[in-house]
Amino acid sequence: MFKFTQHNGIVMPLDIANIDTDIIIPKQFLQKVNKLGFGKYLFHNWRFIDENQSQINPNFILNIEKYKKSSILLTRDNFGCGSSREHAVWALLDYGFKVIIAPSFSDIFYNNSFNNKLLLITLPNNQIDKFFNIINQNPGIYFNIDLLKNEIKVEKKIYSFQIDKFRRFCLLNGLDDIDLTLKNIEKIDSYEKKICNFLIKRKKFVS
């Protein structure tokens, strides 16, 4: 069970708005239904020059040595827009990203991310601009994300962020939708026992 409390990692700056899920992972790589192995397809059309991934695009930031082990992504507005594919979140996590910082996210991507324990931090544009400037001056810099304190530590400076209390609780305790459901299994069992006779009678009535 993964519990998110703190994370210290290299920040990759991706100064592009409206990055959709087809850019995050193209549709031809969505054949599997488990969550593993999608990291190699992350940003495929930007990372590689050819479809077979034999030619790396040297100009894409994730291929630059300092950013290959990035685990925090800094980007722009409306990240994760487009289709609702959950594979986009799986690809980010499988590559190694733990946190994404942006001014805004697509609603469906936002929900998918927290359901898979990927922390999304929303900050105003002026703060995002400041972070981009810091990273451009210090390539490969580490940010420390403290979910217990809702703080981002950059060198000796501390920046606060807000997050939905329920989402925060789930991340801190390593809970997903299934875990939350199982916490109420006794109530669910009790409810099902109460409705059982009604369902049987209804079934007989219909037949």
Curated annotation (Swiss-Prot):
EC class: lyase
Pfam families tied to this protein: Aconitase_C
GO molecular function: 3-isopropylmalate dehydratase activity
Catalytic activity entry: (2R,3S)-3-isopropylmalate = (2S)-2-isopropylmalate
Pathway where it operates: Amino-acid biosynthesis; L-leucine biosynthesis; L-leucine from 3-methyl-2-oxobutanoate: step 2/4
UniProt key word Lyase: yes
An annotated GO cellular component: 3-isopropylmalate dehydratase complex
EC number(s) recorded for this UniProt protein: 4.2.1.33
GO biological process: L-leucine biosynthetic process
Keywords, comma-separated and alphabetical: Amino-acid biosynthesis, Branched-chain amino acid biosynthesis, Leucine biosynthesis, Lyase, Plasmid
Subunit: Heterodimer of LeuC and LeuD.
Family: Belongs to the LeuD family. LeuD type 1 subfamily.
Function text: Catalyzes the isomerization between 2-isopropylmalate and 3-isopropylmalate, via the formation of 2-isopropylmaleate.
The protein's name in its UniProt record: 3-isopropylmalate dehydratase small subunit
Organism: Buchnera aphidicola subsp. Pterocomma populeum
Lineage, top ranks: Bacteria, Pseudomonadati, Pseudomonadota, Gammaproteobacteria, Enterobacterales
